[in-house]
């Protein structure tokens, strides 16, 4: 059975693509139809490809892979942080700093500085420093935590990267490809899928859609690490004519 059901995808709005004028023709094979100026994603393919992504991530986790979640848009930031943390992995949910992967040595120095400031506070150094200096240190720590807090304890460059919206995260994807890191991504109808190793055709602008897919990949990691079977999605009342039902839903929602 599928790890995510058609019903779950519909309820989360995963089928809504972008306006047709904003599409990337390379996504044509993942589009079922167009309604009212909006592309409708073929959820039968999403179900199948989500299964492939789940298996890939689960197997990677079973081999102790380091997995980095990336999603810096506001719709993704919370889910990326929450689900990566739940799975015991790492995340970047604010601006991607150029060179995060390709210049890992420099990033490690910034992380070391973050840890140093934290240690200074824990050891009571802040108590003997001038208030102005403490304020500057706190400001520096806040900035470092914002951009690097999610990878503070990442032991090495990741083995796998999961991305929400590779169109927005082009720099991150390019760095991963340069280093040979496989990329799993939620890919909307406006994105270029060429640099993505495992594509999940999906609406990457809806919070519920991002949460659904991201949580399922976190489940895959947990299953891979712990050997626990994740919940399997049952199709309930959406079966063979599901694509036609998708069109009806889209027409209803855009009427």
UniProtKB/Swiss-Prot annotation:
| Similarity section | Belongs to the universal ribosomal protein uS2 family.
Q: Which InterPro entries match?
A: Ribosomal_uS2, Ribosomal_uS2_bac/mit/plastid, Ribosomal_uS2_CS, Ribosomal_uS2_flav_dom_sf
Q: Which GO terms describe its biological process?
A: translation
Originating species: Streptococcus pyogenes serotype M28 (strain MGAS6180)
Asked if Cytoplasm is a keyword of the record, the answer is no
- Please state what the protein is called: Small ribosomal subunit protein uS2
Q: Can you supply one Gene Ontology CC term for this chain's record?
A: cytosolic small ribosomal subunit
The organism's place on the tree of life at top rank: Bacteria
What keywords is this UniProt entry annotated with? Ribonucleoprotein, Ribosomal protein
Chain's gene name = rpsB
Q: Which GO terms describe its molecular function?
A: structural constituent of ribosome
């Amino acid at each position: 059975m599928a790890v995510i059901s058609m019903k779950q995808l519909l309820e989360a709005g995963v089928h809504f693509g972008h306006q047709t004028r904003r599409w990337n023709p390379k996504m044509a094979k993942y589009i079922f139809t167009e309604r009212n100026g909006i592309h409708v994603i073929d959820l039968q393919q999403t179900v199948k490809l989500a299964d492939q992504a789940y298996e890939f991530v689960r197997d990677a986790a079973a081999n102790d892979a380091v997995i980095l979640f990336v999603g810096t848009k506001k719709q993704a930031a919370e889910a990326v942080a929450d689900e990566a943390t739940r799975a015991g992995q790492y995340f970047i949910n604010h601006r991607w700093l150029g060179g995060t992967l390709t210049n890992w040595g420099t990033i490690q120095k910034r992380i070391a500085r973050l840890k140093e400031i934290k240690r200074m506070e824990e050891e009571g150094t802040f108590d003997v420093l001038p208030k102005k200096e403490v304020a500057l240190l706190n400001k520096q720590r806040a900035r470092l935590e914002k951009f690097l807090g999610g990878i503070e304890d990442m032991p090495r460059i990741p083995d796998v990267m999961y991305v929400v919206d590779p169109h927005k995260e082009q720099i991150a994807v390019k760095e991963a490809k340069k280093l040979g890191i496989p990329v799993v991504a939620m890919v909307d109808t406006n994105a270029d899928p060429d640099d993505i190793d495992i594509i999940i055709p999906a609406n990457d602008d809806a919070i519920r859609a991002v949460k659904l897919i991201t949580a399922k990949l976190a489940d895959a990691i947990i299953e891979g690490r712990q050997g626990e079977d994740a919940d399997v999605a049952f199709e309930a009342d959406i079966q063979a004519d599901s694509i036609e039902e998708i069109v009806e839903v889209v027409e209803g929602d855009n009427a």
